[in-house]
Design a protein with these regions (language model features):
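Helix-loop-helix junctions that connect adjacent transmembrane segments
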Residues: 11, 16, 55, 131-136, ...
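C-terminal membrane-solvent junction of multi-pass transporters and transport-like membrane proteins
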Residues: 162, 334-344, 381-434, 438-441
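Membrane-helix boundary/coupling elements in multi-pass transport proteins
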Residues: 104-119, 220-236, 294-332, 367-379
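Membrane-interface "cap" regions at the ends of multi-pass membrane proteins
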Residues: 1-53, 66, 70, 405, ...
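A generic transmembrane alpha-helix motif of multi-pass inner-membrane proteins
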Residues: 371-377, 406-485
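Membrane-interface loop-to-helix entry segments
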Residues: 137-191, 247-252, 370-384, 404-416, ...
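Extracellular loop-to-transmembrane helix junctions
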Residues: 37-135, 140, 144, 250-259, ...
Length: 485
């Protein structure tokens, strides 16, 4: 069965350009994870809270995230449609759950895109010698978003080429720098290997346990978004094979390469005290061993990786909006479901940009965006995995047709337990660490978004939009032996 015939079996027709291969689909997920951005932005916080031993939180979180990635990979194989979280939960638990899963994921990607663009602008404004004022950073953020929109406007092929090159530069740059620093640290014996297991003195084990949990937030914030490739399923050749591999490979490589970079930088750190309080600790470590042009090259690599993350986020969010619009699940669905001559959802692209820009106007923008984005991501993960578990346990006939047989109850239960633990951690750490003003802003923003969705849901309360009554999952069942797990 061809890709177009598979799509028709779900009740849809081919509208987007199906031109992505293995590496491009992998690059979408890897860019959204944006390992380099997370490490450069939050390394100092992790080191300050947990000491050198905090590097192992990356591995622990990576293992937990891989449980979720395995569930998502199988769902992507069974349901190769754009609008992944929306489509998956719709097939497993119905339209109501799908509506909320889709909208929460829209919030996650729009706020995430705004936050990443703001972070890039924060680097670029002082780099070009401009006054580091909030006004200049916001203007640079808008310029970044518009640039990403222009690239997306002219087709997925152009966007994928830019993203592919950026990912290759990020992987090569981070691995080379990590290996060089690791080699230098081992040759010079800057620190023994046991240094990686040291931590700040705490009066009790419980005290350090909380510090370690705090330091693990860097990994929790960074190692998500691996499922983004599923949102370009209708633009990927053989998506039932390539998207699952992209999901798993992007998460595994982000964990492996990220751990390598963390170990290399931590063993090479000249002073934990200085690095943990430095505004750009990884650049401080690089500058301690290499000349300025290497530091400038590292900053360029980070900037390229962050821009690729913005680009991939925009690609992902516009496909999600478009997929929900063709089913009548968003306002102005007819307008947002339009596809241009370049075979991209052009109206969704230019609607997403100003909405994302609005989030950068708040004071304490980074805290608010991070809170909304991270909570939205893990809540959606919970809805998807919970729907999969529900279909297995509560609806055997549905599970037989629509849930891959080897997405076992045990795997779903373990993944859901992990997600709930992360949500509890995020809630606890947000309450004890965020300022009262920022917390109020975040809660108000969440309340306004929820109220808008409820109003829209009440106004639009009619049948099931224009979507097919149920995707024809029975047309492509997995056999007992078919599994990528």
């Amino acid at each position: 069965m061809s890709d177009e015939q598979t799509l028709q079996a779900f009740g849809y027709r081919q509208e987007l350009s199906r031109s992505l291969g293995y590496f491009s689909s992998f690059a979408i997920s890897f860019s959204v994870i944006c390992m380099t951005s997370g490490l450069f932005a939050d390394y100092g916080d992790g080191l300050r809270a947990g000491g050198p031993a905090f590097v192992w939180s990356w591995l622990i979180v990576g293992v937990g995230q891989f449980l979720v990635a395995m569930v998502f990979a199988q769902l992507a194989r069974q349901i190769p449609l754009s609008g992944y979280a929306y489509q998956w939960t719709r097939s497993l638990a119905g339209d109501r759950v799908a509506f909320w899963a889709g909208w929460i994921m829209i919030v996650q990607f729009i706020t995430g895109m705004a936050g990443v663009a703001y972070a890039l602008a924060s680097y670029l404004v002082p780099f070009f010698g401009l006054p580091n004022s909030n006004r200049n950073v916001v203007l640079a953020t808008i310029a970044t978003l518009v640039t990403a929109a222009l690239i997306n406007h002219f087709g997925i092929k152009l966007a994928s080429v830019v993203n592919d090159v950026s990912v290759m530069a990020e992987i090569l740059g981070s691995v080379v720098i990590g290996l060089l620093l690791l080699g230098i640290a081992l040759i010079r014996r800057t620190h023994p290997l046991s240094f990686l297991f040291t931590y700040p003195h705490q009066p009790s084990f419980g005290g350090y346990f909380q510090a370690f949990l705090t330091s693990s937030l860097m990994s929790v914030w960074t190692l998500g978004g691996f499922e983004a490739a599923a949102n370009v399923a209708e633009e990927t050749h053989l998506p039932e094979k390539r998207i699952p591999m992209a999901i798993l490979l992007s998460e595994v490589l982000a964990v492996v390469f990220g751990l390598l970079v963390l170990i290399g930088f931590t063993l090479a750190v000249p002073s934990v005290e200085v690095a943990s309080h430095h505004p750009t600790p990884l650049l401080y470590i690089i500058g301690s061993y290499f000349p300025r042009y290497v530091v400038a090259g590292a900053l360029l690599m980070v900037s390229v990786a962050i821009f690729a993350c913005v680009l991939a986020n925009l690609t992902t969010i516009t496909r999600l909006i478009w997929a929900m619009a063709r089913d009548g699940k968003v306002p102005a669905s007819h307008f947002l479901s339009k596809v241009s001559d370049y075979k991209v959802p052009v109206n969704a692209i230019w609607v997403a940009i100003p909405i994302a820009a609005v989030f950068t106007f708040w004071a304490q923008v980074e805290v608010v965006i991070l809170a909304l984005c991270t909570f939205a991501m893990y809540v959606t993960y919970g809805l998807v995995v919970g729907a999969c578990l529900w279909a297995n346990r509560m609806s055997p006939s549905l599970a037989a047709a629509q849930v891959p047989r080897r997405v076992s109850r045990g795997l779903c239960a373990a993944a859901l337990a992990w997600i709930l633990a992360i949500l509890i951690l995020l809630l606890y750490m947000t309450v004890i660490s965020i300022s009262q003003k920022a917390l109020v802003i975040a809660l108000r923003a969440a309340a306004v978004l929820t109220a808008c969705l409820l109003i829209y849901l009440l106004v639009r309360r009619r049948a099931a939009g224009t979507s097919p009554s149920q995707p024809a999952l029975e047309s492509a069942p997995l056999s007992e032996d078919e599994s990528i797990i």
